[in-house]
């Protein structure tokens, strides 16, 4: 569904590599094993890292096939958050549920990235409804497409900004149009309900019909992700590198830091205090 391509896009856009590899060419950073290159799939978990907004982001790329669930569990156990990549055409698959269950078992905050929104058969709205139905009201739309396919526009529902993308993944802001606001309105209720669940103050504002400010929304998103009460949904195209800037911004600004995890469970099932050292990472 695009995990390796997403990792490759992050490496390229952050400047970590100057040439973006492709799975079909067998030259991606994360699929370095000859067997992976031959089959065109990930077999084992691999580690890469990028620097973004003064934050070191460690990226653990895991296999998507159900037969390699052990690799997923091992990676999630040491991760601070889990980005679950979902195909905008086919929606929830077995691997989606396995990744969700693994992250839940280890108490790791979860984020969805709906990939392949550049495909003409993409249906973000259907996939979002599937996620909402399957995984509950913690699912929170943050970055959504207005159009899908080759001519795509994406909306940041927190900042209420619209973006276009070029062939190299670069984005630029465009004016908000009435039709963009109409699309945003379709997801705003789900967004505000999830944000309101992070504090009594926001819940009171929500039930009173008052607008949640952008500043309040940004803080609530950060706190909700850490607490596990919000599972944000982003979207884009890993191969086109669309939406990847927004995801990296979120990782650097809203995702939990290693210091957020205070304890770990040892083999005997006993909680052990942990004290992460070193530079700020995500």
Spans of model-derived segments:
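Structural and coupling elements of P-loop NTPases
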Residues: 1-282
């Amino acid at each position: 569904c695009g995990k390796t391509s997403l990792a490759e896009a992050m490496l390229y856009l952050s400047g970590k590599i100057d040439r973006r590899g492709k799975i079909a060419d067998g030259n991606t950073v994360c699929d370095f094993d000859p067997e992976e290159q031959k089959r065109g799939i990930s077999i084992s978990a691999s580690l890469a890292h990028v620097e973004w907004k003064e934050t070191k982001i460690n990226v653990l790329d895991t296999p998507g096939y159900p037969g390699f669930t052990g690799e997923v569990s091992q990676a999630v156990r040491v991760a601070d958050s889990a980005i679950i990549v979902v195909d905008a055409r086919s929606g929830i698959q077995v691997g989606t549920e396995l990744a969700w269950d693994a992250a839940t078992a280890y108490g790791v905050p979860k984020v969805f990235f709906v990939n392949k929104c550049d495909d003409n058969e993409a249906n973000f709205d259907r996939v979002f409804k599937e996620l909402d139905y399957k995984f509950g009201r913690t699912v929170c739309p943050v970055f959504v497409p207005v159009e899908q396919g080759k001519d795509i526009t994406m909306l940041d529902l927190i900042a209420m900004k619209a973006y276009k993308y070029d062939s190299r993944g670069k984005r630029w802001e465009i004016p908000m149009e009435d039709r963009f606001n109409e699309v945003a309105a379709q997801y705003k209720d789900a967004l505000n309900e999830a944000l309101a669940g992070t504090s009594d103050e926001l819940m009171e504002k929500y039930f009173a019909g008052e607008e949640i400010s952008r500043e309040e929304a940004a803080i609530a998103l950060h706190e909700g992700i850490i607490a596990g009460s919000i599972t944000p949904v982003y979207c884009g195209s890993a191969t086109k590198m669309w939406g990847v800037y927004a995801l990296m911004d979120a990782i650097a600004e809203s995702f939990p830091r290693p210091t957020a995890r205070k304890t770990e469970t040892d083999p005997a099932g006993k909680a052990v205090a942990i004290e992460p050292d070193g530079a700020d990472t995500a």
